[in-house]
Amino acid sequence: MNNLFKSLPVVLLIVLETFVYLNYSHDLFVGILPFVVIAVITYLYSLNNPVGHSKAFRIRSYFNWMILGLSYASLYMGRYNLTVASAKFDEIGLMSKEAFGTIFGIGAVVYGVSFVVNGPLADKLGGKKTIIIATVGAALSNAVLGYITYSVMKNGGNADSLFWPFLVFYSLNMYFQSFGAVSIVKVNAAWFHIKERGIFGGIFGTLISLGIFLAFDLNGMILNETKTYVNGQPYYHIWWAFFAPAIVLIIFAILDIFVIKDRPSQAGFEDFDTGDATRYEDGAPKESAIAIYKRILSHPVILMMIAIEFCSGVLRNGIMHWGVHYAHSMKITEVVNGVKKVVSIADADFFFQNWGLILMIAGITGGFFAGFISDKFFGSRRGPSAFFLYFGMFVGFVVMAFAVRYQWYDIVGFLSFFMSMCVIGVHGMLSGTASMDFGGKDSAATVAGVIDGFVYLGTGFQSVTLGKILENAGSDPSKWNYWPIFLIPFTVIGLYFTWKIWNAFPESKTKM
């Protein structure tokens, strides 16, 4: 009865949001949705207490991870905004697909390599300080990108005048962004027992998915709301795709200062044994960074997770990024009031029209599926859920190769949703949850940095490679067919290594 009472506000919000979607504007729907998501995960968090924490502890923990999670969501808003902006840049000749692939690819490599320094730094300084570095640095970088965009567009600049400044400052943005993931893992490793992390991984994956939604749909809404018309043609103020995230990031940087605590003891509660591979109970590494890296890179399970997550990086952004460009490139003819009109499937297909929403739902679904079966059916082992999700991706990309070739747009849209669900679920389980399990409180950030670093090395590899492969694809489905075909081998590699870590579980090594 108590759980039913708790669920009533959530149910009412979902009903309200459904009513808004069916009867009012898409922009109002976008504005309300983040509050619905927060309500849902608050309710789910209230149901999950397998180790019997006190009510006071759980309330303080809630505010700690909620602000931390929303800070990370805002980082996503300032990371994938380039994808939204690049589609508009491409339409006006300021950024080709190859240029976008190069900028994002190099930025992703910077993100991945930065973990070599930023992982141990987060373990040493604590996640609170490094999430503040992330939000402030990314805010300033996005503000500069917005100014560059404004200057080039207002002064009639060309693609070359945009490319090099963007390459430099987007890479700087990605350096600061790389503090985000390690900060999350470092803080939450001290606040959550290993038995809580599977379901919590789903909750936190939801917050990450909210960030993807903000990046694609909220940034897209902002561009639509700020556009003007010149000679009857829409003129998009693309700089707001960078200024808006900068403002949001500064707000969360301020909240981080006052709300986040690295450990329960800093908030007036006792620290506790989290049941993971923590070596030193105070959570501070006693080894040099080189010694930690040597230990990590000689651990067979971590090495296999690195291989899996490299593939996840190829696949995740292989869908999220190129799905947008595919949708803008493919054209269909619609008949509206008896008049034929050629439109892109980005404006005609449900899945591509609501790309951010679809990716968010995919992330929520994949995260909770992976976390639930991991904790409830496999004793908090992360390998089995990752295996099932990789198998889903293998089947999905094989079918997608046919769907792209034969222009089955609805099937391509659905499969993009399904495979995003799978890959985000894997990413949450391994980079977000297993890194805490195998790193422990003292080395969690370094392990997360290594694993997530390879995610973005995979991202960089596919971004540059697919950018070159698809540069001249235009609206030719036979050329776009190389998109899913390129990604299929990485599902096979990931499937093999997820099977290899099926029984992996951390050994507790706590020392006082």
Task: Put a short name on every predicted segment.
Residues 380-430:
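C-terminal transmembrane helical hairpin of 12-TM major facilitator-type secondary transporters
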Residues 198-224, 362-363, 452-463:
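Glycine-rich segments within core transmembrane alpha-helices of 12-TM secondary carriers
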Residues 169-206:
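Cytoplasmic helix-loop-helix junction between adjacent transmembrane helices
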Residues 21-31, 204-264:
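Helix-loop-helix hairpin linking two adjacent transmembrane segments in secondary transporters
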Residues 136-159, 391-405:
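C-terminal ends and interior cores of transmembrane alpha-helices
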Residues 124-135, 375-390:
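Cytoplasmic membrane-interface "Motif A"-like loop-to-helix N-cap segments
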Residues 79-87, 299-371, 427, 459-466:
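Extracytoplasmic gate region of multi-pass secondary transporters
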Residues 39-48, 246-274, 497-501:
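C-terminal membrane-cytosol helix-exit motif in multi-pass small-molecule transporters
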